[in-house]
């Protein structure tokens, strides 16, 4: 049963496949039923594992890769639970990022953005975030 279903989904782009598999698992495994509290805890656990691997550095690239995939899968499960379109949510986030950079470039110039210290940059970023 699983083999056939998983095989049918394997031709989808990875995020779409993850979303569909997450949906499928909630229909075939009672233990996989998602609720917000469970998913929040699961996300915290996966992010903690991911950050642990990131702190290990570049030599741990394979584990970073694996843990990032786990984080993304939990995010897909949360998206399914709340009927959030992952593509549109990502597009919105990217558009906001571009808008903030364009605001900063227009107000301060590209050189200021390039040469700002991390502290300076995040002060400017906070300003840009407040502008809609």
Indicate where each model-derived feature is located.
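Flexible "arm" and connector segments at domain edges
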Residues: 1-68, 73-132
């Amino acid at each position: 049963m699983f083999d056939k279903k998983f095989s049918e989904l394997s031709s989808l782009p990875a995020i779409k496949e993850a979303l569909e598999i997450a949906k499928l698992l909630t229909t075939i495994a009672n233990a996989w039923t998602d609720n917000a509290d469970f998913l929040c805890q699961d996300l915290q656990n996966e992010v903690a594992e991911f950050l642990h691997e990131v702190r290990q550095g570049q030599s741990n690239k394979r584990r970073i890769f694996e843990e990032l995939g786990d984080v993304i899968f939990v995010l897909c499960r949360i998206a399914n639970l709340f009927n959030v379109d992952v593509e549109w949510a990502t597009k919105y986030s990217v558009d906001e990022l571009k808008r903030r950079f364009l605001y900063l470039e227009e107000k301060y110039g590209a050189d200021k953005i390039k040469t700002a210290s991390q502290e300076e940059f995040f002060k400017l970023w906070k300003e840009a975030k407040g502008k809609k």
